[in-house]
């Protein structure tokens, strides 16, 4: 549906977007995820037609809409846009906001407005003014207004960031269902890893203007391509390893990995939930509990290993630990990275032996 080829945007000597290519399929949801200043909003604006690319092209249904010789105006691209400030017209009622971009007779407009108000579960607010409704309600109305002209694509730039935590979670689920119901493709820009993972079919991870990884939420989380990606998406423990004889030596013992991989490995990455922690028997301890954080459904403990390294371990809250408990830590799920921080394929699981 939408394709970007080698897209770039420069502001003088500053490169905001560098050589990015992507393809969005019909009805697909993707998130552009990255830290502040990585170029994700600029990329969205290039797709929307709000910025002209310095290089590269944007195609819609195989027709060029941005490039050296053409720049189709935003209003002719027929994309819906939703921003974090909701951007409702303050002088128009809820129903007039929704009807603003709808073509057709008065009765056709009214029918579409009522259809969308029902879809976002707010038919009772038709006559209200924007200042008379809550932030969550304003965001639902913004979604309804974006959907009203039946757009090809919805572009969302940090749409939930101004809402409190619980409302943000609920609204994210609701809006995803609404957009799926309408069958419209969606691009979400966010710096929130949880938002990207829970909202999207696919995540595009950006850093310093570049696309560093693309994949399903599960692929991005379970198989990060770099150490940076492993830390930016989820919690990660990074531990030093060294090849010795015929195995990879770690704080948990010897790891059985292929020799070619083991000789290149310098860092072991383990997710907090992939550790197994047990009370240590005499002489078996390889760590001491230093901190305990209880958050209801999850207990996270900080463990100082015999190697001097500190790790975070998460698990069930039913077995409570206390500081200075002696523990045995093991893992059978890990990834290996080289000295440059790149993942080594072929080193992703195994067992440790003393």
Predicted regions and their residues:
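The feature captures the beta-strand-to-loop junction immediately N-terminal to the Walker
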Residues: 33-35
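Non-catalytic connector elements of ABC transporters
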Residues: 236, 247-354
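Helix-to-loop junction immediately C-terminal to a conserved catalytic motif
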Residues: 48
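ABC ATPase nucleotide-binding domains
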Residues: 74, 78-80, 84, 88-228
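Conserved coupling/switch loops of ABC nucleotide-binding domains, chiefly the family-specific signature
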Residues: 54-57, 208
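Pre-Walker A (P-loop) beta-loop-beta motif of ABC nucleotide-binding domains
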Residues: 20-31, 89
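Conserved ABC transporter NBD signature motif
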Residues: 56-67
């Amino acid at each position: 549906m939408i394709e970007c080829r080698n897209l770039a945007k420069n502001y003088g000597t500053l490169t905001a977007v560098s050589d990015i290519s992507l393809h969005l399929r019909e009805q697909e949801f993707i998130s552009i995820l990255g830290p502040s200043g990585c170029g994700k909003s600029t990329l969205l604006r290039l797709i929307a037609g709000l910025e002209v690319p310095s290089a590269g092209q944007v195609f819609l249904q195989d027709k060029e809409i941005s490039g050296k010789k053409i720049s189709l105006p935003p209003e002719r691209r027929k994309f819906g846009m939703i921003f974090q400030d909701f951007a409702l017209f303050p002088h128009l009622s809820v129903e007039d906001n929704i009807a603003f971009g709808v073509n057709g007779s008065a009765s056709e407009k009214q029918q579409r407005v009522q259809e969308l108000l029902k879809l976002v579960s707010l038919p009772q607010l038709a006559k209200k003014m924007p200042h008379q409704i809550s932030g969550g309600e304003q965001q639902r109305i913004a979604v309804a207004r974006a959907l009203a002209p039946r757009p090809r694509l919805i572009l969302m730039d940090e749409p939930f960031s101004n809402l409190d935590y619980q409302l943000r979670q609920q609204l994210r689920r609701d809006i995803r269902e609404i957009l799926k119901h309408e069958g419209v493709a969606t691009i979400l820009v966010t710096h929130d890893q949880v938002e990207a993972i829970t909202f999207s079919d696919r995540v595009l991870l950006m850093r310093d203007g570049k696309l560093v990884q693309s994949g399903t939420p599960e692929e991005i989380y379970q198989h990060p391509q770099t150490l940076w990606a492993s830390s930016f998406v989820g919690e990660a423990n990074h531990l030093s390893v060294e090849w010795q004889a015929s195995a990879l030596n770690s704080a948990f013992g010897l790891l059985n990995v292929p020799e070619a991989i083991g000789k290149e490995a310098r860092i072991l990455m383990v997710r907090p939930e992939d550790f197994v922690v047990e009370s240590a028997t005499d002489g078996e301890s390889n760590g001491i509990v230093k901190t305990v954080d209880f958050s209801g459904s999850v207990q996270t403990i900080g463990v100082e290993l015999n190697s001097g390294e500190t790790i975070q371990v998460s698990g069930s809250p039913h077995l409570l630990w206390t500081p200075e408990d002696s523990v045995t830590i093991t893992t059978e799920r890990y990834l290996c990275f080289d000295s440059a921080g790149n993942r080594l394929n072929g080193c992703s699981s195994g067992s440790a032996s003393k």
